[in-house]
Regions:
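A short, charge-rich alpha-helical start-of-domain segment used by transcription regulators
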Residues: 1-21, 37, 115
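Amphipathic, Lys/Arg- and hydrophobic-enriched alpha-helical face
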Residues: 11-30, 47, 107, 158-159
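C-terminal flanking helix
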Residues: 16, 20, 41, 111, ...
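Short, small-hydrophobic-rich alpha-helical interface motif
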Residues: 19, 23, 33-44, 64, ...
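Σ70-family region 2.3-2.4 aromatic/basic alpha-helix that recognizes the −10 promoter
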Residues: 24, 41-45, 55-78
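DNA-recognition helix of helix-turn-helix
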Residues: 66, 70, 135-159
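Internal acidic/polar
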Residues: 71, 78-107, 127, 162-163
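A short pre-motif secondary-structure segment
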Residues: 117-121
Length: 164
């Protein structure tokens, strides 16, 4: 029992950054993000016996988190404009601060579905297969969303360069 608890805690710690980014890309509000991550970790621990393969822990817990976050959105005010809340997403740290900020601003401007897969793929280095399982969508859908996101980001960044 203690070994299982220790193993679970290690996996959660290893994935804490990814859990945060996924929750933040869906919920945006820091308090909601904390609640979603906490609720998801508790749910995952309670349902640990449903994890079929320990190597699938990351997509499994990400899926639990995504479901929790989307449930929180459904329970929240129906008039909440989720895309406008994207302004609250923090910028990642990078050597080229100005370009990084411009890119992050463009990522924040993406719609929720494109932004979520972009954050998981590029900021959390999650493989397409794992994103697919975590979000409950096909790998083809993940690839299509990444392609659309890249196209939109290319346009946004070229417009950004023109204004400089």
């Amino acid at each position: 029992f203690d070994d299982q608890r220790a193993w679970f805690c290690e996996r959660v710690n290893e994935n804490s950054g990814g859990l945060y980014w996924l929750a933040k890309s869906i919920l945006h509000n820091d308090e909601d993000v904390k609640d979603a991550v906490q609720d998801s970790v508790l749910t995952a621990y309670e349902k640990l016996d449903t994890l079929r393969d320990e190597h699938s822990f990351k997509p499994w817990i990400m899926r639990i988190l995504a479901n929790t976050a989307y449930s929180m959105i459904r329970r929240s005010k129906p008039n909440t404009d989720i895309d406008s809340l994207a302004e609250e997403l923090p910028a990642p740290q990078n050597e080229d601060r100005e370009e990084s900020m411009a890119l992050w601003q463009a990522v924040r401007g993406l719609g929720e579905s494109l932004r979520t897969v972009t954050v998981l793929f590029y900021y959390d280095d999650m493989p397409i297969k794992d994103i697919s399982r975590a979000l409950g969508i096909t790998e083809g859908t993940v690839k299509a969303r990444l392609s659309r996101a890249r196209a939109k980001l290319r346009i946004a960044m070229s417009e950004q360069e023109e204004t400089l």
